[in-house]
Amino acid sequence: ELGLPGEKSGFVPTRAWKQEHFGKPWLKGETLLAAIGQGYVLATPLQLAVMTARCVNGGYAVMPKLTRNAIDEGGETANAADFPKIDISARSRQILMHALDEAMNHPRGTAYNSRIMDPGLAAGGKTGTAQVRRITMLERESGVKKNKERPWRERDHSLFVGYAPVDQPRYAVSVVVEHGGGGSKTAAPIARDVLKEVQRVYAPGKLAKREADR
């Protein structure tokens, strides 16, 4: 929690929740939908960034702050190891980080065209495309219009979550472009520019010099 008005909680549905609210049992297909963030799943851009950070930082439940540094109760600068661990195995983290790396740096990855090619600055991440309207079976049979052929309000949202650098993560980012279309076309290039610039400006050597000059 940032302590700002308007914050919203995320939501991951359960079998009990669906039964209580709709009086219907959970379907196997809904598990697959939830796994890719569809169906009843809700998340804000900030929550997506926090999720990414927690998965790649060693499994520590870091919390975002609107300050230059996160300060603990003793007045010391907090780091990831100061936070509790989340319930994710080392094996699961390894698989996830490899997948995020491949999605951005493998030629067949969905974000390959937005990869960072500067030595030592490579990022990992995943594109996302959020459907904003229901597509009927009749539309599917007759042919669904391409995103750019639809009215703006019916176009998909463009998403991307990522982190950098891939070998020693320090930064996490999420980008959501409303009605921006596919994640690889709109959100991923923005995230690439952000991750590249933050690594350039806050390179470890530059950070050490700034702290020494303070």
Q: Which functions belong to the PLM regions below?
A:
Residues E1-V177, R214:
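Beta-lactam-recognizing serine transpeptidase/beta-lactamase-like catalytic domain environment
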Residues T44-V50, T186-D193:
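Short amphipathic alpha-helical face segments that pack within enzyme cores
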Residues Y60, G182-T186:
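Extracytoplasmic/secreted cell-surface and envelope-processing proteins
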Residues G75-P84, P189-R214:
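Short, gly/Ser/Thr-rich active-site loops of penicillin-recognizing serine hydrolases
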Residues G180-G182, R200-V201:
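Short beta-strands and strand-coil junctions in structured, solvent-facing domains, enriched
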